[in-house]
Amino acid sequence: MAERAPRGEVAVMVAVQSALVDRPGMLATARGLSHFGEHCIGWLILALLGAIALPRRRREWLVAGAGAFVAHAIAVLIKRLVRRQRPDHPAIAVNVDTPSQLSFPSAHATSTTAAALLMGRATGLPLPVVLVPPMALSRILLGVHYPSDVAVGVALGATVGAIVDSVGGGRQRARKR
């Protein structure tokens, strides 16, 4: 049987992998981001450290950790409902192990976006611009998510982050004014 040619999202993934996988440090960085974001544990640790190190901003850091966790949990729930399988094409190299075969949406992209939005609020820094693109790209480079999994994960994370901010963090800022 002839090997099927990459089309659609698979072709995008193949193009990303072809362009980036051999660049020095790219694969190692993508794997590091993957491990950091697994079950949103890196974001939870960072939020806890922020809450300890910056007591005046403790609430904002705890809200950021809670938001990342909630975003991750929602993404996992959606994965279990949708049950889309991870990319499976001979032209795609899978460059990291995953805890499940479910793909949609990317929980890494979801929790990273929520964490970046909420930690950006805590620090006053534009963290979504700095943190979200590398994590999103890493999911495609590693061959574990279709681009649509990542895009929906980013949108979901932004939505959850905004809701958590309005419920948990927004009231605190309003009182400080």
Swiss-Prot record:
GO cellular component: plasma membrane
Keywords, in A-Z order: Cell membrane, Cell wall biogenesis/degradation, Hydrolase, Membrane, Transmembrane, Transmembrane helix
Molecular function GO labels: hydrolase activity
Subcellular localization(s) per the UniProt record: Cell membrane
Catalysed reaction equations from the record: trans,octa-cis-decaprenylphospho-beta-D-ribofuranose 5-phosphate + H2O = trans,octa-cis-decaprenylphospho-beta-D-ribofuranose + phosphate
Annotated pathway: Cell wall biogenesis; cell wall polysaccharide biosynthesis
Catalytic activity, EC: 3.1.3.111
UniProt GO BP: capsule polysaccharide biosynthetic process; cell wall organization
Stored PANTHER family: DECAPRENYLPHOSPHORYL-5-PHOSPHORIBOSE PHOSPHATASE RV3807C-RELATED (PTHR14969:SF62), SPHINGOSINE-1-PHOSPHATE PHOSPHOHYDROLASE (PTHR14969)
Family the UniProt entry places it in: Belongs to the PA-phosphatase related phosphoesterase family.
Protein name, UniProt field: Decaprenylphosphoryl-5-phosphoribose phosphatase
